[in-house]
Amino acid sequence: MKEIVRALEGYGPPKDKAAEQCGWQAGGALCPGGLCCSQYGWCANTPEYCGSGCQSQCDGGVGGEGGCVDLGCANTPEYCGSGCQSQCDGGVGGEGGCVDLGSIISRSTFEEMLKHRNNAACPAKGFYTYDAFISAAKAFPAFGTTGDVDTCKREIAAFFGQTSHATTGGWPTAPDGPYAWGYCHKEELNQASSYCSPSPAYPCAPGKKYYGRGPIQLSWNYGQCGQALGLDLLNNPDLVATDRVISFKAAIWFWMTPQFPKPSCHDVITGQWSPTGHDISAGRAPGYGVITNIINGGLECGRGWDARVEDRIGFYKRYCDMFGVGYGSNLDCYNQTPFGLG
């Protein structure tokens, strides 16, 4: 069940900031409000930040895919909601697109996908709820709403496929099959390691451990995640296992955030990631298998057949079938070199 999901620093820093804000310098964090992340890890929407070397969101939140209000353009709820003048789906909906995550995954579908999560034998009984998931997802407007309807559904299937494996309580002969037992756990079973790798920007708090918690079993990178969510997770890592909305937010943050040199899981499943020649040489082709490589490639990929990889695929296929969408290609990572190793 343990997942090792470790995230790995534009121009001069604002005078009131002491640490980089985004990009690889900040653990892959994105700038708030769609601002550009410069090559040096700072946020703004000027040409110096959004031009050469820009790491992410390089239209600065003012490009052609956002909704338009009287003071500018972006694709956040503040711009695309009340008072929006045009293109109010923010570039993620429209004809064949998906604006409302609730229209992609309904409460009844959520319950059927995770039908045994509240079994008396599950340590996470009563913790994971549909309302918490939907509430958390609102902090990430592009999650599950990017592309056409099939792409949106496939992203949700992939997200729950990976997180269900991370939290599974299933076994081969389990009632309704092993892939109906996702979200049975909320904390890593082996909590002996502290998963502490201190740095000046993210010092480990005395007595705190950063083992796997929540749907994605977030490990190590509580500092980066907390910074992105506006929370002190270094001193309060248990929030990821005690606050159900924060738990889902942490998982979706990991899903949406590139981890240098890895792309984000979101960009892979929505077709926005294009492999480099180096990726192609390493066997990393677009598909669900690359997401497994992003999450736990160092332990599961490039080693031939692996039961853990098969388990991830099994959950994903079940959910795709429920949504009525195809699986895509390249589902495993058996012949992929892990990111960072080649």
From Swiss-Prot:
UniProt keyword Nucleus present: no
Entry-linked SMART domains: ChtBD1
Keywords carried by this UniProt record: Allergen, Chitin-binding, Disulfide bond, Plant defense, Signal
Signal sequence region: 1-19
Record GO biological process: carbohydrate metabolic process; cell wall macromolecule catabolic process; chitin catabolic process; defense response to fungus
InterPro entries xref list: Chitin-bd_1, Endochitinase-like_sf, Glyco_hydro_19, Glyco_hydro_19_cat, Lysozyme-like_dom_sf
Recorded superkingdom: Eukaryota
GO MF term set: chitin binding
Disulfide topology: C22-C37, C31-C43, C36-C80, C84-C88, C122-C184, C196-C204, C301-C333
Pfam families assigned to the protein according to its UniProt record, in alphabetical order: Chitin_bind_1, Glyco_hydro_19
Start and end residues of each Chitin-binding type-1 domain: 20-60
UniProt-listed SUPFAM superfamilies: Lysozyme-like, Plant lectins/antimicrobial peptides
Function, in words: Inactive chitinase-like protein that does not exhibit hydrolytic activity toward chitin. Binds strongly to chitin and possesses antifungal activity toward the fungal pathogen Altenaria alternata in plate assays. Probably involved in defense against fungal pathogens through a mechanism that only involves carbohydrate binding.
Sequence similarity: Belongs to the glycosyl hydrolase 19 family. Chitinase class I subfamily.
Protein's name in the database: Inactive chitinase-like protein 2
Species this protein is from: Hevea brasiliensis
